[in-house]
């Protein structure tokens, strides 16, 4: 797994734990740093900060374009993967659009249900098509 792939995976862990425990993602990061004295990968931190700062808009896009699904109905891990993928797709110009989608699908293949990769691919693919109008 690439360094960025590991960073995505760690960001997913942080965001997932924060959601499950009703904590701030930054509190989870701080707690992990204190417990392990590990240096947090800068890209992990960038993802967490990006998702947190754009979460309202990201969630609105996901609610609007996930046909027949609400965020609450989605498996938690899918919701977090979609938030990371949407942030990379719409708000991080350093990641090519296709890479953002394929990396999100790869996370879903290893961490979620059998149906999740195609759902995530379809939803992020739709957001990729609409990207110019979403950011206008």
From Swiss-Prot:
* One Gene Ontology biological process: DNA-templated transcription termination
Query: Does Transcription appear among the keywords?
Result: yes
Pfam assignment, any one? NusB
CC terms in the record's Gene Ontology section? cytosol
Q: Which domain of life is it from?
A: Bacteria
Does the UniProt entry include the keyword Transmembrane? no
Q: Tell me, what is one Gene Ontology molecular-function annotation carried by this entry?
A: RNA binding
Q: Which UniProt keywords apply?
A: RNA-binding, Transcription, Transcription antitermination, Transcription regulation
Q: What does this protein do?
A: Involved in transcription antitermination. Required for transcription of ribosomal RNA (rRNA) genes. Binds specifically to the boxA antiterminator sequence of the ribosomal RNA (rrn) operons.
The Swiss-Prot or TrEMBL record describes its family as follows: Belongs to the NusB family.
Name under which the protein is recorded = Transcription antitermination protein NusB
